Every structure is written in C-alpha cells, then in structure tokens.
C-alpha cells in the first residue's frame, strides 16, 4: 500500500509511546509535506540528542553533562532527595520551583507483568547514595498507580532502615477542580493528605 520508505517511517513512528497506526500515518504524511530541510533538521536533532545526551552519574537524570546542571547547583539542599520514576517527572517538579533538594531517577517502576523487578531499576544506587550521604529525608514522588504503589512500598521498606525520614508527595484535588467530579480514590487521598491551616 505504501512505498517502502514511507512504510518504514510509519513503522518507526509507531514505536513511539502513545503513537498508534493512524497517528503515525498522519505524522509521516505531515513530515513529507514539509520542506525537506525541516525533515533533515528533525533527523539531525534526533541524532544529536542520542549522541550527546546521557545520564547523570549521580541522579540519573538525562543530561549532556556529568554531573547534570541540577546536581552541580551550589544552592541545592543535599540532605533531601526526591525520588521519581522518570526524567519527565523530575521536570514536572522542577517547573514548580518549590523543591530545592536533589533528585534520584529510578528509570521506571516495579512491574512484574512486564518483567521489571527492583534489580532493573536504580534502587541499589539510591540505597548506596542514602547510606553514604548525609540524607535526612527521602521524598517519594511516584505516581499512585498499582506499579507506583508497589515501588513506593518497596522503597520505603529499604530506605527507612538506613535512617532518613521517608515521605510521599500528597495526592488530591487539582486547583480549580470540583468535588462532585472527583473519583472516590482522589477524594480519599485528599482527605488523608489534609493539613492544618
């Protein structure tokens, strides 16, 4: 149905998360309608990113330098580590400009159905880091999915043994949200995470 190069492009686009066959087809046609220079710039950006971006040896965030910009910032509070599953979670927290400590990126969540156990994540490195540094608090900023809950329980069990306070970010209602539209789990978490005013 498609010429071989177009079929290959669609096939490769489909491998991206959240991209199904129809979206891959739309993206491929869009790219081919644009000037050739734009497609080449996109290809060059992909090549540069894959060649120049690695992971920070300390926090495992994506970075072109080692250690990363965040780990090198002198004003960061080294006694607090925020644990996230993926670099995109770190970016979301950084956008708030509220957290002033350091991070640790696990590289995923425990998921036995997909064959991902604690050994496949950067948990050993986290425990070594907490044990070696003067860490007073470990904040678990992990999504409240089944895999996230499993990972949170596993981490809290092993991190607590090392001595620091283990906390978890609160989950609840979004700003501007209506109570009547919130699901039971969200409301329960909001009630659990309430604080004095």
Curated annotation (Swiss-Prot):
Domain of life: Bacteria
Keyword match Cytoplasm: no
The Toprim domain, residue ranges: 79-174
PROSITE patterns xrefs: RECR, TOPRIM
Record-annotated disulphide pairs: none
GO molecular function, one term: DNA binding
Keyword Zinc: yes
Entry's Gene Ontology BP terms: double-strand break repair; recombinational repair
Keywords (A to Z) from UniProt: DNA damage, DNA recombination, DNA repair, Metal-binding, Zinc, Zinc-finger
ZnF (C4-type) ranges: 56-71
Pfam families reported for this sequence: RecR_C, RecR_HhH, RecR_ZnF, Toprim_4
Annotated InterPro entries: DNA_Rcmb_RecR, Rcmb_RecR, Rcmb_RecR_Znf, TOPRIM_dom, TOPRIM_RecR
Similarity-based family: Belongs to the RecR family.
Function: May play a role in DNA repair. It seems to be involved in an RecBC-independent recombinational process of DNA repair. It may act with RecF and RecO.
HAMAP family (alphabetical): RecR
Descriptive protein name: Recombination protein RecR
